[in-house]
Structures are given as structure tokens and as C-alpha cells.
Amino acid sequence: MSKLLETLEEEKTVEQKPRSQEEEDHQDSSKKEELLESLCTPTSSDHKIPEVETCPPPPRKRPREISLTKKTRLSKDLRFFEATDVGSQEVETLFVHEPNHVRKKRRSNSA
């Protein structure tokens, strides 16, 4: 521990030696240059992002699948109307077209 303290004190005394202004300026400028060089963006090809030659195709939409429960429910409903006479008649009554001609009233332009 004492050796460590002695070396630190020696470094302080070395740093405290009076220097000429030119030497200090030169050392400061060299430190600044080193700092600037270490802060530069790397420009080598290893550090660059590679260019994309062709764009990938867009993702395709997946076809919608009806779940099995919906399929079975639909098929059961259809079988009911096909199997019974009452069911088929009921369906026909829903879609029977009765010819009731509805006359639309025309507006008169005279007011």
C-alpha cells in the first residue's frame, strides 16, 4: 500500500514540473488529435451496411379458413332444410315473390 502511495506522489511531482508554454500547447494539441482520431466514424467497407440488390417480395395473405365448428354447424343447417319437407317449404315461403305492383307517386312540378 505504501508503494502505491509513493508512486502516486511521484507522478504528481512529475506533473507539477514547470513546462514551457509551447510544450504544453504541443502536448494539448496532440491529445486533442488523438481524441479526435478515436472519435471518428469508421469508414472501411467492413463497417458499412451492405446495399440490398433486390427487394424481397411482399408477404402473401393466407387464405381464411372456416373453423371446423362453423363448417359442421353450416352443414347441419343445410341438411335440415334439404331432409324435411316442412323445412324446404319454409324456405320457399321466405323467398316467394308475390306480384304486388307498387305504384310510385310522381311529384308534380306545379307548385
Curated annotation (Swiss-Prot):
What is the source species?
A: Arabidopsis thaliana (Mouse-ear cress)
User: What keywords is this UniProt entry annotated with?
Assistant: Cell cycle, Nucleus, Protein kinase inhibitor
| Classification via PANTHER family | CYCLIN-DEPENDENT PROTEIN KINASE INHIBITOR SMR13 (PTHR33142), CYCLIN-DEPENDENT PROTEIN KINASE INHIBITOR SMR2 (PTHR33142:SF89)
Could you tell me the superkingdom of the organism this chain comes from? Answer: Eukaryota
- Asked if Membrane is a keyword of the record, the answer is no
Q: What's one GO MF term for it?
A: protein kinase inhibitor activity
Which cellular compartments is it found in? Nucleus
Assembly description: Interacts with CYCD2-1. Interacts with CDKB1-1.
Q: Where is the composition biased (Basic and acidic residues)?
A: 10-35
Q: Where is this region: Disordered?
A: 1-66
- Cellular component terms (Gene Ontology): nucleus
Q: Which gene encodes it?
A: SMR2
Q: What is its main location?
A: nucleus
- GO process terms (BP): regulation of DNA endoreduplication
This chain belongs to the protein called: Cyclin-dependent protein kinase inhibitor SMR2
Keyword Cell cycle assigned: yes
